[in-house]
């Protein structure tokens, strides 16, 4: 299934990279990922304070979907290396002092949560189950795998798998759309299936290769 995208006009001018230019901002714009999209669409229709883990291969779209417009939350992005047992209180204080629009949720996004130490996970878990964070907080942790996460941490969160299985054809379709939108000549169209396969279903890597092809055309 190809993404429902509206592309800006271009002619081989790349003031920003293709991966940035075509980064999806709405749930419907993501390539593949039908199950995560359905889950997030339901959540966006009636959001509530909760904790989630988005897990799957690097580059599949976990962080971008967490920031989708439909979620309607004020995002606060925390790299996992800053989320350790020693500074959990500092993270909590920052969340309380962030500017918040009335009625909006606060999104605390922790990337690469599987890199957190067990002590950091349990320290954060103790705060998730208390009133430490603002009551309107949504936590989304991204991870390449669940293997490095504590069982107690997993039991407190809802896991959503971002599987790249079967995405190769969808990525190839996206690349063809972008090639045409960027003014690539039909007779010079590269093998999009090959690019998709070589990227191992990493959309960002596929777009980097496509950008190289466009510059060489």
Segments from the language model and where they lie:
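P-loop/Walker A NTP-binding region and its immediately flanking N-terminal helices
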Residues: 1-170, 174-180, 187-197, 205-214
